Amino acid sequence: DVYKRQGLRYAAPDEPERTVPVNAYADCAAMGPQDLVVIALKSHALPAVVDSLAPLVGPETVVLPVGNGLPWWYFLTPGNPLQGLRLASVDPNGRIERALPLGQVLGGSVMASCSCPAPGVVRHHSGGKVVIGEPAGGASDRASDWAQVLTAAGLPTAASTDIRRDLWMKLLGNACSNPLSLITQATTDRIVDNPGTRAVFKNLLTECLALGRRAGLTLDVDVQQRIAQTRQLGAIKTSMLQDLEAGRWVELDAILAAPLECAARLEFDAPWLKTVFALAGLRAAQAGLYGDHGVSG
């Protein structure tokens, strides 16, 4: 109703706020099959609503999920050491996989810092690049064509030949910054400036890099440089901290539980990920914003 009444209000640094008209629908059946369906939901919300998206997805529809963490399809494509691994933490009953044919999916990642202070209001703080690519990797006309369409529409988008790597690169930031901000309720600059939490951040980052490489990814990352880049972003309030403060369910499963599923299958020891997941999970559960469970061992 908010979108129908007032459209989408958008504000960005050094730009006047503007309102974008939106054709909003409460029922997907009223829209019919689309050329492109962009799924920008939090990962934990998708299983409950994915069946309702069926009217949007025709035989030629391209589905572009752009959530944080590891998506359900991440290990379903050939050519990786964990081929066929189904992430129960992300798609617990296989509902997403059944509803969205893998052949119609493009992988996607949004490199931006934004917030939604009120319904129908988006504040864009930094970044803004979108990366899309074939789940199995490699170049494709489909990815290139949609990157051009999105860019022409005002959303700078690049076609990637290794979207799984791009998603893991973003995971490096999410898995370190988000849970630490949830636990400490601090912005990223304070986390990196504090010697104790900086050490935890560094150990998490190092462990996530090693896990990604064990999973077959080529990750050329300098840990100290990545930490410095995080600090240069300034006082970022992560999405997980925003959700905690707003009383919204937090996105721990795709960001921490899914990598831990990967680690378990590879028999890769991940003590920092396990510890931070346990602490962040309990912190969120205490606030009523996450299931009261964790990873044992």
Task: Please place each PLM-identified region on the residue numbering.
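Rossmann-like NAD(P)(H) cofactor-binding subdomain of soluble oxidoreductases
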Residues: E17-P117
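Short polybasic amphipathic segments
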Residues: G7-A12, C208
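C-terminal or late-domain output modules
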Residues: S177-S181
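Short, small-residue-biased leader/transition segments that mark boundaries at the very start
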Residues: V2-Y3
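Internal alpha-helical scaffold of NAD(P)-dependent oxidoreductase catalytic cores
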Residues: L56, E97-K170, L182-D220
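NAD(P)-dependent Rossmann-like dehydrogenase/reductase catalytic/cofactor-binding core
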Residues: R190, R198-G297
